[in-house]
Amino acid sequence: MRQAWLVLALAIGVACSRSASSLDIATTTSVVNSGLLEAILPQFSDYRVRVHAAGSGRSLVMLAEGSAELVISHAPAAEQQALAGHSDWRYQKLAFNRFVIVGPVSDPAAVATSPGAVEAFKRIAATGRDFVSRGDSSGTHERETMFWRLAGISPSNDHLLTSGASMAVTLRQSANKQAYTLSDQATWWQLEGELPDLRQLLWDDPALLNTYALLYPVENLKAAALAKWLTEGPGRALIGAYQIGGRKAYEVWPAGCPGSLPDATVCAGSR
């Protein structure tokens, strides 16, 4: 079998010719920033995997355009919309962790004592604190937008700062601005040692559940091979074993727990 190589094509405009031995996937930036894909994909030997880190929204567009053959996404609403227009796509939940609200160590908005994420967003707005938004149709931005909506708030442009970039860039910008932000837990763990002016403030609200899914055309056998490797083969164990600072970064989707639709949630007792 051929040795697989992981190519992180962070600049999406990179031109590359597709061959029978390569597989182009587009993905949320979080599984790149967290180090997960770099850790596990070199073990996949069927094809040479080329990874385009684009954010969930852009990744789904790439799949529809044919510039990606498989997507790893964590944006259920965008996934539902994409599936509605592509009956030939297969959908399968892959793993989960949590979103976390991160902010200044001093926590001037008292997010750490908030009963939940929606109340935390209300407190951030009420105290006039800066919030750094991804602003890029990513899965993290989708969840952030949902929290603002449920809070009944249209955040002021004076206090809503848009990074338009990856989760890693957004966290660094939050540290520089002493601002709050929403992050996936794994990327935060990967960077927290570099960002002593920030701390994790809220993570235990069920609304912060963060699910990852695979989407790919049914007829694409290369994509199907990688999907099977990730969900049923050695890749599944590698995801479950991946740690950051001795902490388990992802939980694999529980066996026997329905995961064929974007609104699927983790079975009781599995979180």
Annotated model-derived regions:
Residues 101:
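Serine endopeptidase catalytic core focused on the charge-relay Asp
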Residues 96-98, 128:
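Residue-level signal for tight coil/turn positions that link beta-strands
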Residues 16-46, 57, 61-67, 75-76, ...:
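Exported/periplasmic ABC-transporter solute-binding proteins
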Residues 49:
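Hydrophobic anchor at the start of a short beta-strand
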Residues 70-96:
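Acidic, polar ligand-binding/catalytic clefts
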Residues 4-13:
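Bacterial N-terminal signal peptides
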